[in-house]
Amino acid sequence: MAPQDAILGWDEDSNAEAYNAFTRAHPMYDATSRDLARRSHLSNASLVVDLCGGAGATARAILDLIPAHSRVVSVDKAAAMQRVGCRTLTDARLTWITSPAERLADHLHPSSADAVVCNSAIWKTDTAAVFAAVAHILRPGGHFVFNIGGGFAGVRHPDDLSARTGPSLNALIRQVAAEAHGYTPPPRDADRSPKLPLETITEQLTAAGLTVVGTEVTAQHSTMAEKRAWLSIPVFARPEGDFTHAQRMQILDTAYAMTTPDAPAVTSWLVVVAQRPKAAA
């Protein structure tokens, strides 16, 4: 089954607060943020863009690695997410721009950024337009580092295949919804292509003038307890369809009761490192 995406609801205060609370209490976004920041060549960076930066989880990771004189610009179209970020992350090196990722080049000078980092969001955008905007604002030699959920990229880490010992929490949610509410999940489409495979990414990056210099399929290890907390965030709550949030939380609680809290849950990611070619000598 194609993974459920979360496109709408990011600019609602209740969601922004729940999302930020999750990032503070659980390691999931902190871990992926630090992984991307580590790959972004930030030791001598002057300007770094946190693209689709939300409430600032990735900005925190970037700020820990850049020099004291450097700047971070966090760009996101959800003002609610940025309001939470402004309240909770007050580093003077960080500024916020409320804008769609596709309009990034409207807000930064050409060839001004040393790196652009995008965590857990690129597949929600018009990637061809975003890649072109990133290429416009990156300096020659600058890096663009992002990740794509394995279900959207069509990849799975070996740990994702071997760690599971029973039904996933998502599968149990669908089961409970079917039994208690007559829910019928969307039909499986085994032949459906992934939304954003590496081949498509590479073609679009090349068209934008960027070169793929590294890729890796990674595994993020968590627990059923962390997965439950993540699924409590309104934009991620399941199942899809005509349910209230309260109903979804009741379904989640019933499904979670059928699991072991510390049972392993593994998420696959495709990490991509691209670079704007250096100017010819």
Q: How would you name each of these model-derived features?
A:
Residues 47-51, 55-104:
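Class I SAM-dependent methyltransferase SAM/SAH-binding core
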Residues 213-263:
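C-terminal helical/coil "lid" or tail adjacent to the Rossmann-like core of SAM-dependent
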Residues 106-116:
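A short acidic, Gly/Pro-enriched loop at the edge of an enzyme's catalytic core
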Residues 129-140:
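A short glycine-rich, Lys/Arg-flanked "PGG" loop and its adjoining helix->strand segment in the class I
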Residues 192-208:
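Short alpha-helix
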Residues 114-128:
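A short SAM/SAH-binding and catalytic strip from SAM-dependent methyltransferases
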Residues 1-43, 57-61, 81, 145-178:
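Conserved class I S-adenosyl-L-methionine
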